[in-house]
Swiss-Prot record:
It is a multi-pass membrane protein. PROSITE patterns: NA_SOLUT_SYMP_3 (PS50283). Residues 1-14, 107-130, 188-189, 275-295, 365-403, 447-454, 518-618, 672-735 are cytoplasmic. May polymerize. Residues 553-572 are annotated as: Disordered. CDD domains: SLC5sbd_DUR3. GO terms for biological process: putrescine transport; spermidine transport; urea transport. This is Urea active transporter. It is found in: Membrane. Disulfide bonds: none annotated. The gene is DUR3. GO terms for molecular function: putrescine transmembrane transporter activity; spermidine transmembrane transporter activity; urea transmembrane transporter activity.
Amino acid sequence: MGEFKPPLPQGAGYAIVLGLGAVFAGMMVLTTYLLKRYQKEIITAEEFTTAGRSVKTGLVAAAVVSSWIWCSTLLTSSTKEYADGIFGGYAYAAGACFQIIAFAILAIKTKQMAPNAHTYLELVRTRYGKIGHGCYLFYAIATNILVTSMLLTSGSAVFSDLTGMNTIASCFLLPVGVVVYTLFGGIKATFLTDYMHTCVIIIIVLVFAFKVYATSDVLGSPGKVYDLVREAAKRHPVDGNYQGEYMTMTSKSAGILLIINLIGNFGTVFLDNGYWNKAISASPAASLKAYAIGGLAWFAVPSLISLTMGLACLAVETSPNFPTYPDPLTSFQANSGLVLPAAAIAIMGKGGAVASLLMIFMAVTSAMSAELIAVSSVFTYDIYREYIDPRASGKKLIYTSHVACIFFGLAMSGFSVGLYYGGISMGYIYEMMGIIISSAVLPVVLTLCSKDMNLVAAVVSPILGTGLAIMSWLVCTKSLYKELTVDTTFMDYPMLTGNLVALLSPAIFIPILTYVFKPQNFDWEKMKDITRVDETAELVQADPDIQLYDAEANDKEQEEETNSLVSDSEKNDVRVNNEKLIEPNLGVVISNAIFQEDDTQLQNELDEEQRELARGLKIAYFLCVFFALAFLVVWPMPMYGSKYIFSKKFFTGWVVVMIIWLFFSAFAVCIYPLWEGRHGIYTTLRGLYWDLSGQTYKLREWQNSNPQDLHVVTSQISARAHRQSSHFGQVDEII
């Protein structure tokens, strides 16, 4: 057996983990300051979790792609391509892409029914009370724990393999930078770092693709790769593939992976509050487009990286440059995620190892930041605000969010160390997740899509489903392999059985329990009872001249409520500052701008928003059906049944299509967000120039003249509109 020796020194691992972590943390701290100074983005409790509910399409799409690029997206897809052939990588990508597009339906429904929500668990609590809330709290937290532990175990393993870095150290050090920038910038920092990480990953994937298929001295063309992979099939044919070929989509193991992936990833998308955070943070106009674009853009990443590095590993395994030459990778080495770095090292030397390491670092940290926000928002709004201090101020809630981020980061580092010592791999957690959590998928969907499902069905069906799934998984393992070990429970058929039972069994339980215990006939209007956090005290503390009541209307009730949230010293500061003013300062301008539109205008805007969401929902249903057929039926099934072995021309065409698709992804999530945000980028850079050149007065003049362009104004107008529309009674018409 060839030994895989670390191609890079330990210092490289620590430099990337600590150095890049510090760089990103510093960049986000600086960015948070710049946005506060030039765009008036003030990090309140609401802003920390929802980013003002106004994030545009491109940035949300980039964040969706980044959150869905796990280590397994890069490593497992390449491993499956290496083990099962060309269908392996496609099965991974198609099995995990559809859920993102389908989630657009839930994103739109959340915007329609509960525009003030912070987590999907708030919707569950509103509908089913504390019992239902407690049940789904378990599934939400379990999802975050499983996803984060998989990220840390896989990331630390790769750093150890490529640099010799201590695995325990990497488990604890990888989250440090992520926690720091998440604490300072909240979900907006997550969006921005997700964007940067996505750009880096896509660039590296394109570098690998052009190196393998165009410029490499070892390979250099699709035809050369094709010939070498066909030769590899003669040396070690694939069990379960037609004629043992890698260049066929008739693959039993890859077909099983497609089903397991499809089932398991419904849970990791629909039950992970991180995706709901992004949906809630998106502007209403972005809800559909962001998830549709994000899903399609993401598909190209695992498809092309596996098509490139999985097949390249097969093609170069007889090259003297291969890390384990003259032996190929063992199954243990391949399953440990070494396919991608082995191919990169063989083709690009140490540069390939560095690129692999950088890509894995980006995948771990970007996905983990989303998990931190997901857990902190659940802990803050579904535990602390609900059960500990229902009248907590925004300041207390943001402090709670910070504590939750730190605690979860530390806890997951410790848990990942335990998994490492227990010998549990990334692949094992990835395939096992669906067994644990997927029974809650259908009940969550029906919580938003059906009036009839009652409390008993909502609570009992996922619990029964999880129990039956675990039992089926273990019974199948015992009956087929006569013993229960990590290796036997990781086999294809037990994993397939457990995942199928988990996802599908609630489809039997829910109708029965709903019929026996009577349909609920839920009133969707109750979803409007979910409220936003009052940001008054936090905004006044940031700028004492901001007043969040309509002074012109002299609304005494609102003014008294606002004043009750502001300390006497802050009131005195406001009075003293106002006495000094000759002209209205920025705080007063902001206050006036927030109340510039009357209630009728706001209601008309909300009506149009609801109509736009209703149109988007119809399109989302169509896209869901279309892409389900395209990705899961129309392309793979005929190719599987025909037993077609790719010709050289067909394979070349497939490579070209995937490269073009990734260029589309690059445009959608790297260039388009810059275009959408060009005005904000320009005004921020211009304000920075004015400050650095001693012309700060111009910044003040611009902000006073254009309050409608300031984030605090747009977010507070939205908050005011939805606060005053709690009586809006058209929800039943749009569901």
